Amino acid sequence: MDKNELVQKAKLAEQAERYDDMAACMKSVTEQGAELSNEERNLLSVAYKNVVGARRSSWRVVSSIEQKTEGAEKKQQMAREYREKIETELRDICNDVLSLLEKFLIPNRSQPESKVFYLKMKGDYYRYLAEVAAGDDKKGIVDQSQQAYQEAFEISKKEMQPTHPIRLGLALNFSVFYYEILNSPEKACSLAKTAFDEAIAELDTLSEESYKDSTLIMQLLRDNLTLWTSDTQGDEAEAGEGGEN
């Protein structure tokens, strides 16, 4: 199937909410080796975000059930085995994406915006791996995530307006990384607040086409700040849950 047909099929799969099919199409497009257009890049991102998101959600539910079944050995064993099955799927998906990033996407990009987008993606998928990692593996995975986010963050500060949705989405996810993975609420709040304040100060630079995406992510940053600075702690919002790239 040629590239245009694969892209069309990916769009069809998205409308049908068949994200595994959508991801398979965009994986094939990526493996053809050409640099992806913005539209193709977003299709790839949306597909895998949904594919991995379903497993992350399942993993949280089953982990919670596993913890609650202490004392009921058979039930706990069943929950543990099921969690491990979901973990295997989740790891395979993350490794798939990380392989595409390393082999094709990061080397083939020509614009700083694309580099930030793909390095953010690399940080995200190592973060998802870190959520389910344990023991000796975890530190290396966490380091990989932090390095990718940090590199993306440095480039975004040099090359992008504070209101750019990719720069804002990166700040959002990097702050979630500090809060959830590194257990550093002060650093998470500082990063999120700085990103929000810098964007507010330059609202007049917002382009019409990115207005909706940027303001949505700013709202998510503010929601997280409210959550993190209050006594109640729930699930943090994350870029992509609403309408980020």
From Swiss-Prot:
The keyword Ion transport does not apply. Gene3D superfamilies: 14-3-3 domain (1.20.190.20). GO terms for molecular function: phosphoserine residue binding; protein sequestering activity. GO terms for cellular component: melanosome. The record marks 56, 127 as: Interaction with phosphoserine on interacting protein. Keywords: Acetylation, Cytoplasm, Phosphoprotein. Signal peptide: none annotated. InterPro entries: 14-3-3, 14-3-3_CS, 14-3-3_dom_sf, 14-3-3_domain. The modification Phosphothreonine is found at residue 232. The delta, brain-specific form differs from the zeta form in being phosphorylated. Phosphorylation on Ser-184 by MAPK8; promotes dissociation of BAX and translocation of BAX to mitochondria. Phosphorylation on Thr-232; inhibits binding of RAF1. Phosphorylated on Ser-58 by PKA and protein kinase C delta type catalytic subunit in a sphingosine-dependent fashion. Phosphorylation on Ser-58 by PKA; disrupts homodimerization and heterodimerization with YHAE and TP53. Pfam families: 14-3-3. Highly expressed in brain (at protein level). PANTHER family: 14-3-3 PROTEIN (PTHR18860). Interacts with CDK16 and BSPRY. Interacts with WEE1 (C-terminal). Interacts with SAMSN1. Interacts with MLF1 (phosphorylated form); the interaction retains it in the cytoplasm. Interacts with Thr-phosphorylated ITGB2. Interacts with BCL2L11. Homodimer. Heterodimerizes with YWHAE. Homo- and heterodimerization is inhibited by phosphorylation on Ser-58. Interacts with FOXO4, NOXA1, SSH1 and ARHGEF2. Interacts with Pseudomonas aeruginosa exoS (unphosphorylated form). Interacts with BAX; the interaction occurs in the cytoplasm. Belongs to the 14-3-3 family. This is 14-3-3 protein zeta/delta. The gene is YWHAZ.
